[in-house]
């Protein structure tokens, strides 16, 4: 057999190995123990079997053994640090149970959302300002103390209440026109600044479930009609035209603690009609429609008298 060495070659090889090396290599020692008397053996088959046994032992030696075990790249020498161990598996499971953080948004997306929010807010404010301007244009200036949103809304509420009361007074007047009125004759009470004429002045007073209405004057003189509902007064004055007449009348009416909320002026030939919407302020001494109609009648008669005397003095 070509793979087997002769006894002489083995002897030469064993002569070159030191004692220390022979002690470390167990297969060679076993070989020497097995082959004590090589020349005394008469059976060549026994010698061949011994050599085969030696080669088998050499193949199993720790010096010549080659391991073909492939190491897992994820496996470590320390079993405690191996992620496939029991503790490692628990750690992986615990990591999977953690709450996933939300991915950060893109800067462009964040900027887009911010610009959209700004545009929506600007549009809302623009619409609100348009509504407030429309509401402001429908109200008299006397209801607007300031130009802020709260004042405009509060003034609109007050104006609506005034309109409701005016509507009630007009409905009362309409019902009153359908009933019989009892005229009464009264004399005009003159003051130090008022010259009373000799003409008779008729005064009509009617009551209704919504308020009290009084008429004062008639004919070619100043005619005043007042309707009182709680602390609101609807006043209508018909008189002849006069220079700066309405300005003086407004000043005198406000001196009576009557706040002018609304004023409408219409004319017919030589006469002019003033429609006032008044509110009785604190400290107003006039409490009834008769008192208000009488006071306003005196104011316009005084103004017309002053105009008449000024015209006479010029001539």
Swiss-Prot record:
Segments passing through the bilayer: none
Main location: nucleus
Tissue specificity annotation: Expressed constitutively in leaves, stems, and flowers.
GO biological process entries: guard cell differentiation; regulation of DNA-templated transcription
Biased composition (Basic and acidic residues): 172-183
Coiled-coil residues: none
Keyword Secreted belongs to the record: no
Listed GO MF terms: DNA-binding transcription factor activity; protein dimerization activity; transcription cis-regulatory region binding
Induction summary: Repressed by heat treatment.
Localization, UniProt: Nucleus
Domain bHLH span(s) in chain numbering: 112-163
Region (Disordered), start-end ranges: 66-111, 172-197
InterPro entries associated with the record: bHLH_dom, FAMA/SPEECHLESS/MUTE-like, HLH_DNA-bd_sf
Biased composition (Low complexity): 185-197
GO cellular component, one term: nucleus
UniProt KW keywords: DNA-binding, Nucleus, Transcription, Transcription regulation
Comp. bias intervals (Basic residues): 94-104
Assembly and interaction partners: Homodimer.
Record-given protein name: Transcription factor bHLH57
Organism expressing this protein natively: Arabidopsis thaliana (Mouse-ear cress)
Gene expressing this chain: BHLH57
């Amino acid at each position: 057999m070509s793979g087997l060495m002769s006894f002489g070659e083995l002897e030469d090889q064993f002569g070159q190995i030191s004692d220390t090396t022979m002690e470390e290599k167990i297969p060679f020692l076993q070989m020497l123990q097995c082959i004590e008397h090589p020349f005394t053996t008469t059976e060549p088959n026994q010698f061949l079997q011994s050599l085969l046994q030696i080669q088998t032992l050499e193949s199993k030696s720790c010096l010549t053994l080659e391991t073909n075990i492939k190491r897992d790249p994820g496996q470590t020498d320390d079993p405690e640090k191996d992620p496939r161990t029991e503790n490692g598996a628990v750690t992986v499971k615990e990591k999977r149970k953690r709450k996933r953080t939300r991915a950060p948004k893109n800067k462009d997306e964040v900027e887009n959302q911010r610009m959209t929010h700004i545009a929506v807010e600007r549009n809302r404010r623009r619409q609100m300002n348009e509504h407030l301007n429309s509401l402001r244009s429908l109200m008299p200036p006397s209801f607007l103390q300031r130009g802020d949103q709260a004042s405009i809304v509060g003034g609109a509420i007050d104006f609506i209440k005034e309109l409701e009361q005016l509507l009630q007074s007009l409905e009362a007047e309409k019902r009153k026109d359908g009933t019989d009125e009892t005229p009464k004759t009264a004399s005009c009470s003159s003051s130090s600044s008022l010259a009373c004429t000799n003409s008779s002045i008729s005064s009509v007073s009617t009551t209704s479930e919504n308020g009290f209405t009084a008429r004062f004057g008639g004919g070619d003189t100043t005619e005043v009609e007042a309707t009182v509902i709680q602390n609101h007064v609807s006043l209508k004055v018909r008189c002849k035209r006069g220079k700066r007449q309405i300005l003086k009348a407004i000043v005198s009416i406000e001196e009576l603690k009557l706040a002018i909320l609304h004023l409408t002026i219409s004319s017919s030939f030589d006469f002019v009609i003033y429609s006032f919407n008044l509110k009785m302020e604190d400290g107003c001494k006039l409490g009834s429609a008769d008192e208000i109609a009488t006071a306003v009648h005196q104011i316009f008669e005084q103004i017309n008298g002053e105009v008449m005397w000024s015209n006479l003095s010029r001539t």
